[in-house]
Structure formats: C-alpha cells, structure tokens
A protein has these predicted regions:
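Catalytic cofactor-binding cores of redox enzymes
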Residues: 14, 31, 52, 92-93
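Glycine-rich, often proline-containing surface loops adjacent to acidic residues and nearby aromatics
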Residues: 40-51
Length: 174
C-alpha cells in the first residue's frame, strides 16, 4: 500500500482544505519550495514521539534519531508511484520534502542540540502568518523575533501571546 504520497490523484484534483490558514499557505508556500503544495496536499506520514527525561537525554535521543532518519526513510519507503506511474523514486514523499522549504534543521544541531539552540532557531524562522481579529494575515520576510520586538506592521505592532508562538511552531516542519 502506498501511504507516503497519494499514488493516484493529480494535485489539481485534490480539494483545498477550507481552513483559512491553508488559503494563506497555498498562496505563499510555493515561493519557498517547488513541491510545497504537494507536501501540503499529497503527502502523509507516521510520527514517532520519543519521551525524554532531561535536556541531556533529549540531546542524545535527538542525535540518534537524526542519524537513524535515512534508515527509517529507506525502511518505510512506500511511495514510488505518482499519478499512477513510477515516480523514479522509492520514496517520492522524501523527494517532496527535500523540495519544501519550511523546515529542516541546520547541520550544527546534529552534533550539539539543546533547547536554547532550538528556541533560537524557531525565533529566527520566517513566519507564514499571524492570526489576529479572527483572520490569518500573511507575513513575509519577518521572523517571530521581529514579532516579539513589535516589528510587524501588518498587525499594528501588537506583541505576541503564547497562542501566537504555538501557531508559529506549528508551521516549522523539522
């Protein structure tokens, strides 16, 4: 069973998600990666949650999982078909994610990851949007750090709340 990438449907045949955030993402994400819309609408995956007991334990488990990722991709490669034809990849899903510019971690994290580095990384990631007054506002070329410093003119320089950070973190795909 092909489960990592829709093996049959063309992108144009997939209905758009009616949520307003997806309207903004559908418009803006292709600027950051040629296959961003395929990632949004035609991929799926299995997640693994790993508990940790301390920052040191987290760092060790993060490093191990990073090194194991290529093996996991190979073991679970099940998306060789795209639009009823061979895609030329055992994991077309992996190819799509390599052409989506909303995530991945700098290679420095692979050796020496800690909470502070991830927080700095997250605060420096460009934002996709802000949710304010029951509306998603597209934000381009601004980081969450800019938002924290009141430098987002699109929302009258309001300062972020915890819910804004949660929303931003939900748009960083690592």
């Amino acid at each position: 069973i092909s489960a990592g990438f829709d093996p049959i449907s063309k992108l144009s045949e997939i209905p758009n998600n009616p949520k307003q955030r997806y309207e903004v993402m559908t418009k803006d994400m292709p600027e950051g990666g040629a296959l961003s819309l395929d990632m949004m609408y035609r991929t799926c995956g299995t997640q693994l949650n790993i508990d940790y007991t301390s920052e040191e334990d987290f760092s060790k488990k993060f490093k191990l999982s990073t090194y194991l990722t290529p093996i996991f991709i190979a073991i679970f490669s099940n998306s060789a078909i795209k639009e009823n034809l061979s895609s030329g990849y055992l994991s077309y899903r992996a190819h799509v994610w390599q052409n989506t510019n909303r995530g991945g971690l700098p290679s420095i994290f692979f050796e020496d990851m800690d909470f502070e580095k991830y927080a700095d990384f997250s605060m420096s990631m460009p934002m996709l949007f802000i949710f304010n007054q029951n509306k998603h506002f597209s934000i381009k070329n601004k980081t969450f750090k800019d938002f924290m410093n009141g430098q987002i003119e699109e929302v009258n320089n309001i300062l972020p709340e915890e819910k804004d950070l949660e929303l931003h973190l939900s748009t960083i795909f690592t």
